[in-house]
């Protein structure tokens, strides 16, 4: 398997912020990318990349992940073209189709970021510009409600959602939260993130093991029922910790430590207070989950 040189084009124009490209040292970038890969990517990804131009692919994934973990939602807009270009390349090879499934479930974030980027600017103030800010949570909610409204049920969802709901209910978690699987993976159990999250509910290895899943000889994260039970247990634990479903969903995406630190930093128990300070992906993830649950179930996340 060989990926075309399109990755070089993506790196030059699709993933790097303009301010970063002027004095870019490719040697430094590749060295940093290799170190990042060893620290952040699971063994299966590294094995897959052994037969491709690994420096370019890893550097692409490095910047991709960094933007998702970044501070500003609109920065994700510049990844849209790159993601659309690389998706069919990943889809074309069985070895990388799980990563295509993961990326496909996140194209929405880049589209939403483009929409937010195109909103009319506020009138220029007479005083110096204030610090850069993220769009309000309310604006993000409105965008996601419009985006998910026309969507049919994902493939396979009708077959497995009833059983997933039964499992969530048995774990004392609102059944409507099974729709996290649509946001996480598009109900594609093959989905795998570059960092090693796998399955319908994108569980990391440590989380999966903590909640009783086996990763070998068969990875139970790719089995709908065991994965749903582990995800439900994790969500129940997060809700017990934070007492709020928005905070619990944010923690599911970004980690409980991230949410806890922000709550402590801003001396609050409110999701609304910390929402603009969450990682960019999480800022888009929570309102997307809300809009998806509203569309599929007619329910409100904060009232579950």
For each predicted feature, which ranges?
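Cell-wall glycan-active module
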Residues: 1-182, 192, 269-270, 276-277, ...
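Solvent-exposed, acidic/flexible segments
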Residues: 150-161, 170-173, 193-201, 220-228, ...
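Glycine-rich, acidic and aromatic/proline-enriched surface loops and short helix-turn segments
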Residues: 170, 182-187, 200-213, 254-258
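Short, functionally critical alpha-helical segments immediately adjacent to catalytic or ligand/cofactor-binding
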Residues: 172-190, 231, 248-253
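Primarily short, surface-exposed interaction patches in extracytoplasmic proteins
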Residues: 178, 187-194, 215, 222, ...
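Substrate-binding/active-site groove segments that recognize
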Residues: 195-217, 228-235, 261, 286
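A structural motif
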Residues: 202-207, 253-265, 286-302
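Catalytic and binding regions of secreted/periplasmic enzymes and modules that target cell-wall glycans
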Residues: 235-264
């Amino acid at each position: 398997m060989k990926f075309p040189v399109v990755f070089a084009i993506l790196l030059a124009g699709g993933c790097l912020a303009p301010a970063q490209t002027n004095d870019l040292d490719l040697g430094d970038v590749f060295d940093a990318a290799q170190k990042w890969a060893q620290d952040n990517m699971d063994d299966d990804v590294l094995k897959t990349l052994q037969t491709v131009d690994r420096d370019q692919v890893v550097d692409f994934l490095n910047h991709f992940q960094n933007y998702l973990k970044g501070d500003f939602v609109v920065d994700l807009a510049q990844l849209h073209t790159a993601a659309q270009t690389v998706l069919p390349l990943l889809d074309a090879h069985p070895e990388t189709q799980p990563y295509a499934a993961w990326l496909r479930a996140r194209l929405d974030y880049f589209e939403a970021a483009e929409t937010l980027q195109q909103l009319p600017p506020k009138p220029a103030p007479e005083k110096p510009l204030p610090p850069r800010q993220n769009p309000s949570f309310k604006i993000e909610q409105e965008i996601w409600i419009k985006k998910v409204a026309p969507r049919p049920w994902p493939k396979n969802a009708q077959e497995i959602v009833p059983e997933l709901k039964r499992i969530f209910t048995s774990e004392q978690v609102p059944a409507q939260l099974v729709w996290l699987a649509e946001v996480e993976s598009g109900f594609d159990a093959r989905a795998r993130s570059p960092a090693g999250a796998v399955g319908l509910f994108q569980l990391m290895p440590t989380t999966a093991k903590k909640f009783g899943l086996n990763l070998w000889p068969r990875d139970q994260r790719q089995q709908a029922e065991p994965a749903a039970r582990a995800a439900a247990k994790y969500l129940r634990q997060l809700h017990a910790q934070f007492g709020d479903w928005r905070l619990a969903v944010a923690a599911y995406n970004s980690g409980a430590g991230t949410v806890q630190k922000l709550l402590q930093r801003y001396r609050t128990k409110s999701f609304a207070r910390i929402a603009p300070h969450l990682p960019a992906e999480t800022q888009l993830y929570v309102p997307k989950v809300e809009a998806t649950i509203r569309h599929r179930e007619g329910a409100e996340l904060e009232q579950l």
